[in-house]
From Swiss-Prot:
Signal sequence, renumbered to the chain: none
Name of the protein described by the UniProt record: Coiled-coil domain-containing protein 196
Domain of life assignment: Eukaryota
The keyword Magnesium appears for this protein: no
Residue ranges of coiled coil: 83-117
Region feature (Disordered): 122-161
The organism of origin for this protein: Homo sapiens
Keyword annotations: Coiled coil
Protein encoded by which gene: CCDC196
Basic and acidic residues bias spans: 135-144, 152-161
Length: 297
């Protein structure tokens, strides 16, 4: 009886020591898991911040582009250009906005997946705590564990599973980085195409505006200068008057020059009439001063 009691007493301290070792090992594992969890959270925070900043920038850029498109639409409508090209650009801008919103949703889903993986890591830590509590309960009841090597096996399996999951998370992180780089490249390509189309529309609008101005000038010249040319090219007008008026009309650019020409022509006509009257009056005076014999001859 005494030998049995001594053997049972010697067995209990060895069990207590092994349980203490297991407890310490599990505590270390839990601390390691907590540190890794904090590292993952710290890695996720800058990604979230970058995602939010990029989304804000994209939304602000889209708003500015919509405003510029509206301004261009107003300008094109004022200049009489076709609105179909502007409507197409607006549709393209709306499609770009929808694509960006879809990609943002995908990024949010990926962030949620990362958060779920962190929760899975927490569940693993809880599962590791479960055998700890069982061992403690068995010790309190005075029952010996069936196999002291079993918790170590479970711990090694948990470590392996955790390491595999960490590797998977890193692979997924690298894949997300590559996808993000591709997304940025596609966004830059779309922005460059969009800017190129806007520049082409501006060039076409300027060309149409110049054509409209040329037509207006030609109509203005036809309406204002052709009647004056017809009036000045009448058969009753003198040669000198025709030459001066034609020179003035070809060199003139507005109605003010035409009015000046009219006044000059009128003064020239008055001057020629006055010179003719002076000549006739001088001749009559000379004839009256001559004697009658000279007139008879």
């Amino acid at each position: 009886m005494t030998s049995g009691a001594n053997s049972s007493g010697s067995y209990l301290p060895s069990e207590i020591r092994s349980s203490k070792i297991d407890d310490n090992y599990l505590k270390e594992l839990n601390e390691d898991l907590k540190l890794r969890k904090q590292e993952l959270l710290e890695m996720l925070k800058p990604l979230e911040d970058k995602n939010n900043l990029l989304f804000q920038k994209l939304m602000s850029n889209l708003e500015e582009k919509q405003r510029s498109l509206q301004i261009m639409r107003q300008i094109m409508a004022g200049k009489g250009c076709e609105e179909s090209s502007v409507m197409e650009l607006l549709k393209e801008a709306e499609e770009m906005k929808q694509n960006l919103e879809r990609k943002n949703k995908m990024l949010r889903k990926e962030m949620e997946m990362l958060w779920n993986k962190t929760f899975e890591a927490e569940e693993l830590s809880d599962q590791q705590k479960a055998p700890q509590t069982k061992n403690k309960a068995d010790l309190q009841d005075g029952k010996a564990p069936k196999s002291p090597s079993s918790p170590r096996k479970t711990e090694s399996e948990l470590e392996k599973s955790f390491a595999e999951k960490v590797k998977e998370i890193r692979k997924e992180k690298q894949q997300r980085k590559m996808e993000w780089v591709k997304y940025q490249e596609q966004n830059n390509i779309l922005q460059n195409d969009f800017h190129g189309k806007v520049i082409e529309l501006r060039i076409e609008a300027l060309k149409n505006y110049q054509k409209a101005n040329d037509l207006k000038l030609s109509l203005y010249l036809q309406q204002n200068f052709e009647p004056m040319q017809a009036f000045l090219n009448l058969p009753g007008s003198q040669g000198t008057m025709g030459i001066t008026t034609m020179d003035r009309v070809t060199t003139g650019r507005n109605e003010h020059h035409v009015r000046i020409l009219g006044t000059k022509i009128y003064t020239e006509q008055q001057g020629t009439k006055g010179s003719q009257l002076d000549n006739t009056g001088g001749r009559l005076f000379f004839l009256r001063s001559l004697p009658d014999e000279a007139l008879k001859n």
